[in-house]
Amino acid sequence: MPGNSRRRGAVRKSGTKKGAGVGSGGQRRRGLEGRGPTPPAHLRPHHPAAKRARAQPRRPVKRADETETVLGRNPVLECLRAGVPATALYVALGTEADERLTECVARAADSGIAIVELLRADLDRMTANHLHQGIALQVPPYNYAHPDDLLAAALDQPPALLVALDNLSDPRNLGAIVRSVAAFGGHGVLIPQRRSASVTAVAWRTSAGAAARIPVARATNLTRTLKGWADRGVRVIGLDAGGGTALDDVDGTDSLVVVVGSEGKGLSRLVRQNCDEVVSIPMAAQAESLNASVAAGVVLAEIARQRRRPREPREQTQNRMI
């Protein structure tokens, strides 16, 4: 009879209900926390993109203080012509000789560089199977000066003229600036230890040998180093297209450090704030901004011109005009 609880099956025992008893709508609340954004395909272990990424050979990251190997006949010959300090010239046995290879061997012998002949398979292994044309040049790490030593040497030959590079990334620009510093009577170059081009074979080659005469120092903290130099009487002038001081109005006869910004972003905020003045180069209205190394060369040329013919104090010039 309906309502008779004594009838078999009239009362369902607890826990005997079919289906899930626990869930978002069950007896216990289920956490609904999200799992976060979906990772990129190459980071998912079983995705085909991840398998392709794992299959690709990984090139080790080269540190700035490691030995560098220059590959190819033209690059090696340019390094030897520029006087890049090298420790060994590797030539694969059986390599077909031409004028470039012959000149490389002759210049290495004249410079006292060890000439090592080895099997092509060994040269392939040494260069990680990169294209080498049967020849490679081993270049040791550059011996950087200390910023304090660089400043002391510059102050011994007053007025000091130094160039600091704020995160310049292209070693060719670094080499070109070193060359301009040598051409216009500068005393050295300062670069940050991180996020900056270093003195590699490319930079040395672009400097046309000036890197052998102009010291390059590396600063752990560029802003702090520039502050220390300013405390010792060196005026810090930044170079930027939006600078408030025209190059024509800069007195280049004082001890100076010219700060050149990176190719894309220019001067960083902290470095810009610690400059005594920010200088711009007057240009025609339709002209675009100059390359970093070209702009540095223009400023150094103007400073050298003023030092060859020191300008009169502004007060005397105004009185004479009156």
Swiss-Prot record:
Listed GO MF terms: RNA binding; RNA methyltransferase activity
Ranges where the record places region Disordered: 1-69
Residues the entry annotates as binding S-adenosyl-L-methionine: 261, 281, 290
S-adenosyl-L-methionine keyword on record: yes
UniProt key word Nucleotide-binding: no
SMART domains: SpoU_sub_bind (SM00967)
One of the protein's GO biological processes: RNA processing
GO CC annotation, single: cytosol
Sorted UniProt keywords: Methyltransferase, S-adenosyl-L-methionine, Transferase
EC number, UniProt record: 2.1.1.-
Domain of life: Bacteria
Skewed-composition ranges (Basic residues): 1-16, 43-61
Miscellaneous comment text of the record: Was identified as a high-confidence drug target.
Record-stated family: Belongs to the class IV-like SAM-binding methyltransferase superfamily. RNA methyltransferase TrmH family.
Protein name: Uncharacterized tRNA/rRNA methyltransferase Rv3579c
Source organism (scientific name): Mycobacterium tuberculosis (strain ATCC 25618 / H37Rv)
